[in-house]
Amino acid sequence: MFAIWVNSSLAQNTFQLWNFNAKPGMEDAISQLAENHWGNAKFKSGGIQVERYGHGDEPWSHRIILFGEVGKIGREEEDTKEFEWELFIQKLNHFIEEWGSSCAGRFMSIEGGSWVDFPYVQIYNLKLNDPTAFKSAHDKIVKQTAKTRGERPIAFGSYDIGGGENISHWVAVGSSDFSDRISQMALNEQYEKEWAEWSENNGGASIPSNYTIQVLAAFPNK
């Protein structure tokens, strides 16, 4: 999970996510369909993205994510056409083998640069015993590792509806591509002391799964 926008009231920033399996060879058609429907959209906040799953534990091939602040989700009223979302889904169904799971949640912290500039994202699904303690430890390690991370974005948030068994929260880390992500992991090894402190103070956390996604099409609020 990750955001294509940043807002000061992070607790009010939300996402809604729908997984699906695309028909073979239909990825470009899906991206073009999204461009046709959302390329010139004026969103109240947030936006919409189409993403492809890469490495990891997810069984689906792609997903759609709708972002927005509570009370400001979707297109501006004057930019809205009747049954627009339904029409988009109807056309999208021609390129999809099956729809999968869905979930929704919130962003609790976002640091770094633009996710559009770092579209290769690794997402860690978490089970937290003490979310408050984890956020404190997370915020600290983010600051401690800022020098080597540079402008690459990192976010922390919750699953409030769905998300999976034994999963409550998530962390997302942006990179430019696969090689950049692996290089960042190697650089993180120099923070052995800091990560040991994070582990001791995070309130108890496990990582049931992790995976990567690649942004195929992004239509943020402008």
What is the predicted function of each stretch?
Residues 10-222:
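Short S/T/G/P-rich N-terminal loop/turn motif that feeds into the first structured element of a domain
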Residues 1-13:
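Bacterial Sec-dependent N-terminal signal peptides
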